[in-house]
Amino acid sequence: MDPEPPEPSTGVDSVPRQPPSAHSGPDAQAPSAGGASGTMSQDTEVDMKEVELNEMEPEKQPMNAASGAAVAVVAAGGAEKNGLVKIKVAGSRGWVRTRWALLLLFWLGWLGMLAGAVVIIVRAPRCRELPAQSWWHKGALYRIGDLQAFQGRDAGDLAGLKGRLDYLSTLKVKGIVLGPIHENQEDDVAGTNLEQIHPALGSKEDFDSLLQSAKKKSIRVILDLTPNYRGQNPWFLPDEITTVATKVEDALKFWMQAGVDGFQFRDVGNLTNASSFLAKWQDMTKNISEDRLLIAGTESSDLHQIRSLLESTKDLLLTSSYLSNPSFTGKHVEFLVTQYLNTTGSRWCSWSLSQTGLLTSFVPAQLLRLYQLLLFTLPGTPVFSYGDEIGLEAAVPPGQPLKAPVMLWDESSFPNTSRSVSSSKTVKAQSQDPGSLLSLFRRLSDQRSKERSLLHGDFHILSSGPDLFSYVRQWDQNERFLVVLNFGNVGQPAKLGTSSLPTSTSLPARVDLMLSTQPGRKESASVELEHLTLEPHEGLLLRFPYVA
């Protein structure tokens, strides 16, 4: 017989077979129990080693195309099988229902959020539209009538004023009312040139430089063009008014081209046909820019004359002596303010005690802080003269004409008079004292320029005691402010009545104290209105939040 052909090679060496044992065979006897156990243990150990070698041998073989393809085919087959299983599971009824349920929940949740947003928008109170405001609506104006007195004794010019702009910036004023600074021969129309700066005060180049520097600090410059400011009649004689008016109109064009932001005319009560001239000059400034301001000043406190002047022009600021009444009681000041607001109607007001003078000329020293708080929180533009922020007093020696007081920057500014002046009255000393009049002025000016309720908020007077004047300033959903002023010489409980408030406004039980005119009171504290008591001559600025 032919021999059987050998088995084909698989590419892996076969393990050689062991020769049969000498004891194998049908006739062989089984060994003893002990010998059998030892032999089996050895055989098992040998077999395990052979198995490990067989498992390690393929790992030692080099990879070739055939083996790589085989592995890839196996992997692909496994992945295809897993994918088919996932497709079958995803297409099952349970998963289809689950996906539809989740999709439905998503859209229901989205529609619910949309409906909630619509309800919130519809039910939320609408914000009031902000009124159109110009720069003079947003803060105080600062008058520098005598440039030399403002800077020092008989030494001051436009270049020196430029060096004081940093100080003016700390006061947060929005504009300075400068001058008059033009050439004026006393009571001489021909010798008056409204377009020429007095040589002692500087040149046109100095003025242009001042304008540019002031604008960089967001301070506007208003120029006083009162023609005959050195003479007896500020507007010359009535039969010269035509010539004067022509000079004024030419000067308006000249200075507007130079970049001046506004103009002031004082003592308009002495100007023949003042209403018609003011209206014409206002039109001239508005034709150039709506952002130009016109200020008129009068010493009159007659409401009929004041209303006539205000009705003649649009956006006219009028300074007067209306509030300079010798009666300093809360009820009387409340009456004056109420009458003025009722007379002016919706027109924008300005608040001062005169067209040129200092607060100390009209208000007792103990009420200076109170009047600062009053002027800064009434609805309108507060107008101050230089020195009002430090309580500057006009020193007039007996028998001498009234002169503009020298600004007290430091001890070196003290006037050469026999009257003693305290060093605490200077700008230098008060700048270092957080409880000073100057510090109070700066804080009030800062609040006035950034709080909407104080900028253009509604004004509501509260009923209170005879020596008290109290009111609320509020705008839409912004923080509200409560002002309580005690003009009396003794401490008094507030006892605020709210019957005059609109139904949408009410006073809370507790309010926050922003500031007091008396340095001793603890600020930033919560105050219970029912037990609120004011010290003599004390004013409080309190605030409380809007509640829907």
Task: Indicate where each model-derived feature is located.
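Carbohydrate-interacting/catalytic domains
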Residues: 1-177, 183, 208-214, 275-284, ...
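Hydrophobic faces of well-ordered beta-strands that scaffold small-molecule active sites
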Residues: 140-142, 176-178, 221-223, 263-265, ...
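A cross-domain feature marking catalytic cores of carbohydrate-active enzymes
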Residues: 146, 180, 223-229, 267-269, ...
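Conserved alpha/beta catalytic core and glycan-binding cleft of carbohydrate-active enzymes
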Residues: 232, 236-238, 259, 282-409
